[in-house]
Amino acid sequence: LMDACWVSFPQAHLDSHAMADLALAGHEILGFDTVMPEYSVHQESAALGCDVDWGDRDTMPDGKSFPHADFSDIHVPENILEKPSMRVVLDALSILRRNVGDKVAIMGKVMGPWTLSYHMAGTQNFLLQIGMGEHEKVIKMMRQLMPVTIAFANAQFQAGADVVCLADHVTGDLASPKHYQELLLPLHKELTPQIGGPLILHVCGNCNDRLELFAGAGFEAYHFEWQVDARLAVERVGHRISLVGNVNTSETLFMGTPEDV
């Protein structure tokens, strides 16, 4: 797809026109019924002071520093939406809204406070603190980061997004349903009413054991991966929340047949 539209990583992470062009190519060339101009999980973390290696054509961006590994207070810049790594997404959404807003659904993407905490403190460090019972410490960090999620999501709606995917990686192989219920669910219930548009929660991996919790968090939809039993998900929470996804992107979508998909 990059070859077909003459746009590639890392340019598409850093330049709004390249970002919009690559998103549009997914619709015009591959036939996707949405355009989503964000390909990294590090747009916010770069704006918050993380050292990010933006990779190359064949590798994804990677965080190289954890500026709050000591769980020190996080002071969010007042102009965070104007930081280059976040501004580029807003500008790309505006470009797409002007050009194809009446033809195709435009999706935005933000990181939730749990994922942002991974980037600020380091994933292993953050989860270790939870395992050690330092719950006040991790909740404090997530609360300091929650305004970033809210502000970026609202700005994306204002820029032209029809819907925003909120990714928060409290996945089954990293945290228990109890941890989600006690630590993150209250924050999700608090932030969802503060965002002015439909939200899709994305959590990777096998989350069969927390579907009911997700359904009660205030999101319009849950985007789930192939490890979740789709029939089971529909039976248990399909009457409470819309369900999206369940296609294995690295195997079925990439190497499978149309019939497989």
Q: Model segments located where?
A:
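N-terminal basic, low-complexity leaders that serve as flexible interaction/assembly modules and, when applicable
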Residues: 1-56, 91, 95-98, 140, ...
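Active-site loop segments of alpha/beta catalytic cores
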Residues: 1, 9, 33, 80-261
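Glycine-rich, proline-tolerant flexible connector loops at the mouths of alpha/beta enzymes
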Residues: 34-66, 72-82, 160-180
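Amphipathic repeat-derived elements
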Residues: 1-21, 66-79, 202-208
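Short, flexible, mixed-charge acidic loops at enzyme active sites
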Residues: 51-58, 62-67, 118-128, 238
